[in-house]
């Protein structure tokens, strides 16, 4: 999107693995889903296999979407990438995946947007993200012009059947409860 810089120097290997969705702007393909995760693994063709998973509390079942992603530019001499990818879950149709904030030291959190300011996600390596970091990312998104007042804070509930959480982080005092 206009006036938003993507992160450069992405280490693709370090980016792989499971990410927990902390917050998102609403869109129909994730509506009503809790316990949302994105799992990234290397494909044989050099791309990334994307497995998105979320629990539909109304239907009481897990929904999965499997897709593929590719960096838009060739790697730099240090084998890192610009954080612009294309992602597809529906055949030849690709959407934008832009990494606009990242904990570059440890890859513990990331903020992603789509082709415009209607799509925004905050992801973490753990089911909870500390309040100061979450607040920093929301503030940054707000400065970029995203409608942060419309963010949905995802319920990462370990009581859902077949929920696989890695490390649990306790909610800090004063953190607002996720929308139900």
Regions found by a protein language model. Give the residues of each.
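A beta-rich soluble binding module of mature secreted/lumenal proteins
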Residues: 1-180
């Amino acid at each position: 999107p206009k006036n938003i810089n993507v992160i450069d120097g992405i280490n693709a290997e370090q980016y792989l693995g499971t990410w927990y969705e902390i917050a998102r702007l609403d869109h129909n393909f994730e509506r009503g889903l809790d316990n949302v995760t994105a799992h990234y693994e290397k494909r044989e063709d050099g791309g990334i296999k994307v497995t998105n998973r979320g629990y539909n509390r109304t239907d009481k079942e897990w929904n999965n979407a499997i897709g593929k992603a590719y960096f838009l530019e060739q790697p730099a001499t240090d084998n890192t990438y610009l954080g612009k990818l294309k992602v597809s879950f529906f055949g030849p149709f690709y959407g934008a995946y832009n990494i606009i904030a990242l904990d570059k030291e440890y890859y513990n959190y990331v903020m992603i947007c789509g082709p415009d300011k209607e799509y925004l996600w905050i992801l973490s390596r753990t089911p909870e993200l500390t309040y100061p970091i979450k607040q920093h990312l929301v503030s940054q998104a707000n400065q970029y012009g995203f409608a942060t007042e419309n963010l949905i804070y995802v319920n990462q509930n370990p009581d859902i059947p077949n929920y696989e959480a890695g490390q649990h982080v306790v909610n800090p005092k004063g953190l607002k409860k996720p929308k139900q």
